[in-house]
Amino acid sequence: MTLASAYLSPTAAGDLTEFATQYPASGEHWDKVDDDPFVAHDFDATYVGDVSSGSNKEDLYNLGSLPVGVGAISYIRVYCIVKANNSSITRTANISIKTGGTIYYGTSFYPNSAYNTETETWTTNPQTGLAWTIAEVNALQAGMRINGSVIIPVLTWSVTQIYVLVVFTLLEGLVGTVWQETTKLHWIDENGAEQSKEG
């Protein structure tokens, strides 16, 4: 059994677009957090965000699809690169996913004043309790919720990157890490050389 991985970045808006801020102001929220997982995120060059006051605020994003060659899915892990204008042990946020029409939340986390990587792992689909299927992952939405708070001072949150790592069993004939770049499938062969073809 050979384990492989794919990274899925936002490709379109999901079912919630509640954050009040995006920078730059042009374009869409999803294209502010779609930095290539193989390249360092762009910090404050592009981001979305909101403040931790009043009601909860949440953005969800549709993601790219899995490449060919995916067998059994071991787990998904959502990555969120986030900061607030001050550190806090009272204001929180959650990584979120939407599957089968229902939103599920990861463990609450506190912000740092510098960009920090938050992660949440789901080994099974929380709706079914079973291993993820290809169709479920391809329909997945991922994002983040800022939890409302009446505590002063108000925190301003910024999110610069969100993506999903999918770890799976590689189908026979493909060895090593597999990933998608536009419409092209890349993989590492048994000699350690990168190969590619249209997916």
Where are these regions (language model features)?
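Disulfide-rich extracellular domains of secreted proteins
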Residues: 1-172
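Viral virion structural and adsorption modules
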Residues: 172-199
